[in-house]
Every structure is written in structure tokens, then in C-alpha cells.
């Protein structure tokens, strides 16, 4: 299975937070799974940390990706174009990027955001 972690799913995984569903935890831990973290997610979390809205506890998110055997997913031009032309069911630009990436790359998005269900993507509840 190829998974793309939404920002909250990524943070919950790192913190071993019980809010991450058992199904999501099992899927991410599966050695056969390839787990992606978007560069857009790192950008989003870094912005929130810089604004004082998120405490990363000194975590180096890039090191956390590698340390958990996740794969960094770059934002490509085709992702950007697809995100721009998605239906306006969801207004958050970071979530729209993840939707576009999931569609183009054939990934299952791990998220608890109910608004994402309006799009034609596979979702694993976080």
C-alpha cells in the first residue's frame, strides 16, 4: 500500500498519539507499505511553528521522515496545476496539494479531515 500522511497523521505518528486510529497505525507500520510525507506538509508545519501556533519540540521534520523510513514527496509542477483546478470543496491550500498529490501519484491519503471525502481519492481514516 502507498500512503500519504496528512499533517496531523504525521504528527500523531511521531508523537505516538492515541488519536491516530489503530487502522492507520497498523497500515503505516506495515513493512510492505511505502509511506510518503509531502514537502507541502513540512512547509505547513514549519509555518505554524514559526508563527508560534505549533510546538515541534525541537523535532527536525526532515530527519523524522528519514528516521521513520518514510519517503519525502516533492511538490511538482503537475501537482500544483492539479491543486489549482480541483473543485472548491476544500479551501485549505495545503490539503488541496495533498489531494492533488494523492490523485496523481495513486496514493491513499491518511487523514481525519471529513471534507476530503468529497474528492475522488482513497482515504484511510487517521
Task: Enumerate the predicted regions with their spans.
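Short, well-structured N-terminal submotif of metal-dependent ribonuclease cores
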Residues: 1-37, 50-63, 105, 114-118
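Residue-level signal for well-ordered alpha-helical positions
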Residues: 16-17, 48, 86, 122
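Short glycine/serine/threonine-enriched helix-capping/active-site loop
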Residues: 37-38, 75
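Phosphate/NTP-binding elements of NTP-utilizing enzymes
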Residues: 45
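Active-site neighborhoods of divalent-metal-dependent phosphate/nucleic-acid chemistry enzymes
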Residues: 53-58, 62, 66-115, 121-126
Amino acid at each position: 500500500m502507498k500512503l500519504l500522511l496528512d499533517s496531523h497523521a504525521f504528527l500523531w505518528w511521531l508523537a505516538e498519539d492515541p488519536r491516530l486510529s489503530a487502522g492507520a497505525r497498523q497500515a503505516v507500520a506495515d513493512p510492505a507499505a511505502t509511506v510518503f510525507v509531502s514537502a507541502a506538509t513540512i512547509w505547513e508545519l514549519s509555518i505554524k511553528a514559526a508563527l508560534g501556533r505549533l510546538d515541534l519540540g525541537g523535532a527536525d521534520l526532515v530527519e523524522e521522515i528519514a528516521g521513520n523510513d518514510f519517503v519525502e514527496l516533492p511538490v511538482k509542477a503537475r501537482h500544483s496545476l492539479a491543486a489549482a483546478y480541483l473543485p472548491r470543496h476544500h479551501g485549505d491550500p495545503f490539503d488541496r496539494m495533498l489531494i492533488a498529490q494523492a490523485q496523481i501519484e495513486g496514493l491513499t491519503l491518511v487523514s481525519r479531515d471529513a471534507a476530503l471525502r468529497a474528492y475522488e481519492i482513497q482515504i484511510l481514516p487517521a
